[in-house]
């Protein structure tokens, strides 16, 4: 299946198909593809073809595949020096596109921390083929001419310069631009939930206006002083000339007078120029101030109009719901009525006339510092060396036997949503401070662990002898991870840097899991789960989100790996885009859209899953997912059909004679009797609508457990306060934690700056339980579990854990 590259997005190719024949080195595992207009198979797709033809892939040699006679493109025009348009550097480089075209010459422009490329210099005026942000990118030198730029997610550029000198010039310029971009990013980023970007822009604009005004005043003062001192000098010289002095002195005075006259003429010209500039600056300053005030007034009017439209839209929706019958599967519901919970209050308006109050169950209290044996500083700052007594051990045993089945009900807090969300349009939400009113009492690490809710699908897959059948269960597991999102419209807490979460279900379910927040900017979490039933799941996910006014887009970046121990089958896939609709008015509802390609890197088997976006005008079932399981030759063996919130079925495909294409359902209708239900969603617990629509697993995730690391999400105080319904205290505690994280970051930056000044080495922040290295399969830089957490837990040795709470 050809992995074509869209604008600025690079599609990784499998690149793990064994190369029979006498081919040279295989291609890099991460596909380099061209940008928009360079569509074609990524470097990993045609591995077998390249090997048969005998041509090495774009490795160190940089030769395009296509047979022994292929040659690299002519390396005549490498990167030029600094170009125009304010760019730090621009020039020609060779970029790997695909196995058919190999390396192609592209015009690259490095400016403002962004590396963009075009097919030609003339194309800069209208079409950019791709852009990568260096602030989050990694630059790797392969050999004398080749280097790689990757952001660890969907973008990877394999580049080649015309010479080693040219390559070094580009790499140096890129490293400098990256350092500057990272510094600017750090200056504007004070915490995971930092001050509003719009407020920062406003402050910067006001500061600029004040500076300009001050400079204009200085210019006016200098103008007056030059005129004053010039006149005084001329007068003094005239008086000196009129005095009776010897002839020789008179000659000297005449020379000085001539020079003073030249100075007067020159200074008068400068004074006139300054006066003209001053008048022009004052005129334009007034125009700018008027324009700025006009834009402010327009913004206020636009906000008022948008708010009015939102209210009208809300009234229309309510009137429509009251006058008509909703379809069988509206976007705010999931599945059939028999297993659907009663809907919660989804209308995000300020009206509270329909508030409902419930009797909340008892508050969950958390023992302090039990089970933590630290060699260094303790969480509270005082040394604590508490061992588990017999009574506490008994309590833990009881906790293991009985998992909690409920949490305190969600309180009804009034909130002026519009006052917060109107400033978020087009922004990255991880940079905007949000009250806990928008949250659910779980962290992103715990949400990531929820992917294991249907772990039994991987247990079944591990027992499959047929790799294609195994792929069906892996696909069902992939879809099942979205079933918990159908009602979950609240956001999880952003983890603090170094925060962890463990889930030890080795005795009950045969698996255990550990997550860690490994990066603060961009926010990234690493996850590793292992099962005694024969599988390992690992991933590093970066979450980016944009608020578009009516909806919120959440785009997870990163690759998920699943390895089966007995067969060595190694599967990878990426997540789709999640969209939250009706942010301002109406009932919040969530949709998943996009495609997932699951690849078995050992056999070459693939599964393509399509998440169909919801449409009011479509007659198709809501939340539909379709899929095909194919062998390396592209032949379809199984078709998948279902919904991401309810269930997934598969059936064998009996292709028509000589026909391999067409729709999977049309080809497989003959084998309807072979349909097998792979997965079905578990019903939600009773009263789930009052408990954030948590599943049975989610209800247990924040239950306090002894012996965990002091950085565990269960010990996060603002999250615990929110779960117990004390939201005002939770907001105050959240601000304290963010300020503490901010101070820690500034301390690390100061230490790094001092080390740079002293010329001493300084190690950047490193994750505690994960190591950043190149993935052997995808060749991406990612965090892989180092294998020490459970040993430290057994010893209760948490001395290396940072104090983050």
From Swiss-Prot:
Gene Ontology molecular function: phosphatidylinositol-4-phosphate binding; protein domain specific binding; sterol transfer activity
UniProt cross-references to InterPro entries, sorted A to Z: OSBP_sf, Oxysterol-bd, Oxysterol-bd_CS, PH-like_dom_sf, PH_domain
Gene Ontology biological-process entries: ceramide transport; intracellular cholesterol transport; phospholipid transport; positive regulation of insulin secretion involved in cellular response to glucose stimulus; positive regulation of secretory granule organization; sphingomyelin biosynthetic process; sterol transport
N-acetylalanine modification, residue list: 2
Gene3D superfamilies: 2.40.160.120, Pleckstrin-homology domain (PH domain)/Phosphotyrosine-binding domain (PTB) (2.30.29.30)
Residues in PH domain copies: 86-179
Membrane topology: Peripheral membrane protein
Coiled coil regions in record: 289-324, 728-759
Binding-site residues, 20-hydroxycholesterol: 312
Composition bias type Polar residues, residue spans: 376-386
The entry's keywords: Acetylation, Coiled coil, Cytoplasm, Endoplasmic reticulum, Golgi apparatus, Lipid transport, Lipid-binding, Membrane, Phosphoprotein, Transport
Pfam families with a match to the protein in the record: Oxysterol_BP, PH
Binding site for ergosterol: 312
Residues with PTM Phosphoserine: 188, 191, 196, 236, 238, 336, 343, 349, 377, 380, 383-384, 387
Main localisation: cytoplasm
Region Disordered: start-end pairs: 18-83, 331-351, 369-388, 708-764
Residues with the Phosphothreonine modification: 375
Binding of 25-hydroxycholesterol, residues: 312
Residues engaged in binding cholesterol: 312
Cellular compartment(s): Cytoplasm, Cytosol; Cytoplasm, Perinuclear region; Golgi apparatus membrane; Endoplasmic reticulum membrane
Binding residues for 7beta-hydroxycholesterol: 312
Residues engaged in binding a 1,2-diacyl-sn-glycero-3-phospho-(1D-myo-inositol 4-phosphate): 115-120, 491-494, 520-521
Chain's role: Lipid transporter involved in lipid countertransport between the Golgi complex and membranes of the endoplasmic reticulum: specifically exchanges sterol with phosphatidylinositol 4-phosphate (PI4P), delivering sterol to the Golgi in exchange for PI4P, which is degraded by the SAC1/SACM1L phosphatase in the endoplasmic reticulum. Binds cholesterol and a range of oxysterols including 25-hydroxycholesterol. Cholesterol binding promotes the formation of a complex with PP2A and a tyrosine phosphatase which dephosphorylates ERK1/2, whereas 25-hydroxycholesterol causes its disassembly.
Family as reported in the entry's similarity comment: Belongs to the OSBP family.
Name this protein carries in UniProt: Oxysterol-binding protein 1
Provenance organism: Mus musculus
Taxonomic classification: Eukaryota, Metazoa, Chordata, Craniata, Vertebrata
